[in-house]
């Protein structure tokens, strides 16, 4: 589902992705606060699908903000093989691993997932796990609650 929000003019490019972290103190008195923050869920990764041309003033973003249309971003993560079923809806839990230097660590412990997601596809590439975990790389879409 597409949502309307505001984002810094320098960041407002179709195709860009961001993780919404919530409002800042500086946002409190702003007249645009509701459109900036009320449509987005904290911790969710969004993709910009369209950008409007008008620029609006902002105390946080030096060059102002633009109105953008966003939707939850589809992205790739790694999960345990037994959970990797196309079309299934899951509540995210990171792969149990503390090897922060592993090349797969960020995919096994992704940012920008809050709550549930749907497995849109299982990717064919093989995932090597140094701890011996059976893992799969998948594409997911967050489920809006």
UniProtKB/Swiss-Prot annotation:
Coiled coil: none annotated. It comes from the Archaea. Disulfide bonds: none annotated. PANTHER family: UPF0179 PROTEIN MJ1627. Belongs to the UPF0179 family. This is UPF0179 protein MmarC6_0993. It comes from Methanococcus maripaludis (strain C6 / ATCC BAA-1332).
């Amino acid at each position: 589902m597409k949502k309307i929000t505001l984002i810094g003019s320098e960041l407002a490019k179709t195709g860009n992705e961001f993780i919404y972290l919530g409002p800042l103190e500086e946002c409190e008195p702003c007249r645009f606060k509701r459109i900036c923050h009320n449509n987005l869920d904290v911790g969710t990764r969004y993709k910009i699908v369209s950008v409007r041309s008008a620029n609006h003033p902002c105390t946080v973003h030096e060059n102002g903000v633009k109105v953008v249309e966003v939707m939850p971003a589809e992205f790739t993560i790694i999960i345990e093989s037994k959970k990797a079923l196309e079309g299934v809806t899951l509540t995210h839990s990171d792969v149990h691993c503390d090897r922060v230097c592993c090349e797969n660590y960020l995919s096994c412990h992704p940012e920008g997932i809050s709550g549930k997601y749907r497995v849109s596809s299982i990717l064919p590439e093989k995932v090597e796990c140094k701890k011996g975990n059976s893992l799969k790389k998948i594409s997911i879409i967050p489920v809006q609650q």
